[in-house]
UniProtKB/Swiss-Prot annotation:
GO terms for cellular component: plasma membrane. The gene is lepA. One of its GO terms (molecular function) is ribosome binding. Pfam families: EFG_C (PF00679), GTP_EFTU (PF00009), GTP_EFTU_D2 (PF03144), LepA_C (PF06421). Its EC number is 3.6.5.n1. It comes from Rickettsia prowazekii (strain Madrid E). GO terms for biological process: positive regulation of translation. This is Elongation factor 4. Its main location: membrane. It catalyses: GTP + H2O = GDP + phosphate + H(+).
Length: 600
């Protein structure tokens, strides 16, 4: 397709569960991308985990062919994007490849916190936005009220918002006409020299790395020699194509189009998301700006339960990193858990999804350490450090001050649940910044410490609002804080995998909870086991697992008391030796359960 005025590149943005993927299904069905037999629910959500959870994790692309009412045939490139704040990097990449967006809002729920986050990204990318109100067939639908909400909160005109029911296929033709008439075509190509944006990549066991590109200038052809501008790697293009959503092979991709190519690329490191791809012989002079990298904010350790699985874990992480550029990892070792990896994520859901993908797609059984965030340490000698692993925390005597990250959180909640939500935020050391009302719902803006959020905040927010609250956050500032390194000792030995950095006011509560949990999990042995929580040299909590008593007198049937005394003295000496030299074996099941203590 070489005439760009008949191309439209657009994304669908929305809050979770407002009907993005269902609308994508209906658009594919209406344009004949798949026949009725091939259609399934959430057809663009290709991972099992996406369908089970009802969320989109990976942005997907599909080319649709639509004959408009004006008689012309148009080629529509749809980018279906995630809604959850943890996958904002996927959203940003999709938006950079498009000129416009459909803003889908549930007409029974209205504007939610993550709707705001995603629509502001679209506005920052200079997108034209078409509001679409979904679920108008439901009795609770309030389209006029939601239109007013969109105009008041987001500030875009919603008077001509398209009314649809994606589930029942109502209004789908109106959406397609709005895409044609309201969204712009790609800019005309300014040169014949190839310039393409690397939007995404994934690993295929037969083809090597598959690269998704948006062609900005020129054309990408089969057998062409192309260069990655960031790494200067050169490859010969073997296959070129696009998704309908089935894979469709073609010979060329022209300016304005979105498609994929393969080139027997085996080195994962050559494919940097946001890189510029150009012709080896006639290279473009200036690379595209690419994407602003998302910085991981939540960290934890992944350790294989079987040390023989380490290399398999290493290869699996490399393949996942190719498919998810916002995920980072580095090797680390623990005296308790062996060798593993310290991994960085955009949030807790991101962590959970990566963990589940490693389990499902690569059949790995992992131990995951407690999540932590990046702390800034100001040393007495003038050095400034950034750490996210409690084991790396220097001696407290050498530290001048410590800073922790704070976030700015926006919570939208029905007014009947305001009291419980405010109590939760206060409990988490939050500072209220704003409190306003949108009809019968409140918009609350809080400043919260990130390390209070990474454990159980989202679950408790949903629980105390009966699932009605929506939550979106962004990094704000680092502030001085009274932080301590909470260490767990078993019989005087520090268990590094259970160490965590907490605010001093929370240390005793968290330490006591961990000690009680470990007491229930570690099996009794022939000596007393002391489980202690300490801050520096001070013990703040202790639990004791009482010894099992082996009856050494069971084989004595009466007789001289000196024989019994001799056996008891021998047992006593043995226990003394065990206390002196014995190591307590903590089962891995105890580690796994204890590391779930986070929010208690």
């Amino acid at each position: 397709m070489n005439n760009q005025k008949y191309i439209r590149n657009f994304s669908i943005i929305a809050h979770i569960d407002h009907g993005k993927s269902t609308l994508a299904d209906r658009l594919i069905e209406y344009c004949g991308g798949l026949n009725a037999r091939e259609m399934s629910q959430q057809v663009l959500d290709s991972m099992d985990i996406e369908r089970e959870r009802g969320i989109t994790i990976k942005a997907q692309t599909v080319r649709l062919v639509y004959k408009a009412k004006n008689g012309n045939t148009y080629y529509l490139n749809l980018m279906d994007t995630p809604g959850h704040v943890d996958f904002a990097y996927e959203v940003s990449r999709s938006l950079a490849a498009c000129e416009g967006s459909l803003l889908v809002v549930d007409s029974t729920q209205g504007v939610e916190a993550q709707t705001l986050a995603n629509v502001y990204q679209a506005i920052a990318n200079d997108h034209l936005i078409v509001p679409v109100l979904n679920k108008i067939d439901l009795a609770a639908s309030e389209p006029d009220y939601v239109k007013t909400q969109i105009e008041d909160i987001i500030g875009i005109d919603a008077s001509e918002a398209v009314l649809i029911s994606a589930k029942n296929g109502i209004g789908i033709d109106s959406v397609l006409e709005a895409i044609i008439n309201k969204l712009p075509a790609p800019k005309e190509s300014s040169t014949d020299i190839l310039k393409a944006l690397l939007v995404d990549s994934w690993y295929d066991p037969y083809l090597g790395v598959v690269i998704l590109v948006r062609i900005i200038d020129g054309a990408l052809r089969k057998n062409m020699r192309v260069k990655m501008m960031r790494t200067n790697s050169v490859y010969t293009v073997e296959h070129v194509g696009f998704f309908t959503p089935k894979k469709h092979i073609s010979d060329v991709l022209y300016a304005g189009e979105i498609g994929f190519f393969t080139a027997s690329i085996k080195r994962v490191s050559d494919c940097k998301v946001g890189d510029t791809i150009t012709d080896e012989k006639k290279s473009c002079e200036q690379a595209l700006p690419g994407f602003k990298p998302n910085i991981p904010v939540v960290f934890c350790g992944f350790y294989p339960t079987d040390s023989a699985e380490f290399e398999h874990l290493k290869d699996s992480l490399a393949k996942l990193r190719l498919n998810d550029a916002s995920f980072e990892y580095e090797m680390e070792s623990s005296s308790a858990l062996g060798v593993g990896f310290r991994c960085g994520f955009l949030g807790l859901l991101h962590l959970e999804i990566i963990q589940e993908r490693l389990s499902r797609e690569f059949d790995l059984d992992l131990i995951t350490t407690a999540p932590s965030v990046i702390y800034k340490i100001n040393m007495l000698d003038g050095q400034n450090l950034e750490i996210h692993n409690p084991a790396d925390l220097p001696d407290l005597q050498k530290i001048a001050s410590m800073e922790e990250p704070w976030i700015k959180a926006t919570i939208i909640v029905p007014d009947e649940f305001i009291g419980t939500v405010l109590s939760l935020c206060t409990e988490k050391r939050g500072i209220q910044l704003d409190h306003s009302y949108i009809s019968n719902r409140a918009k609350i803006v809080y400043k919260l410490p990130l390390n209070e959020i990474v454990y159980d905040f989202y679950d408790r927010l949903k629980s105390c609002s009966k699932g009605y609250a929506s939550f979106e956050w962004q990094m704000d500032v680092y502030e001085l804080s009274d932080l301590v390194n909470l260490r767990i000792l078993v019989n005087g030995e520090v268990v590094d995998a259970l160490s965590t950095i907490v605010h001093r006011s929370r240390a005793e509560q968290r330490g006591r909870a961990l000690c009680i949990r470990l007491k229930d999990l570690i099996p009794r042995q022939q000596i007393d086991i002391a489980i202690q929580a300490s801050v520096g040299s001070r013990i703040i909590a202790r639990e004791t697992i009482k010894a099992l008593r082996k009856d050494v007198l069971s084989k004595c049937y009466g007789g001289d008391i000196s024989r019994k005394r001799k056996l008891l003295e021998k047992q006593k000496a043995g226990k003394k030796k065990m206390r002196q030299y014995g190591n307590i074996e903590i089962p891995q099941s105890a580690f796994i359960a204890a590391l779930q203590i986070g929010g208690e």
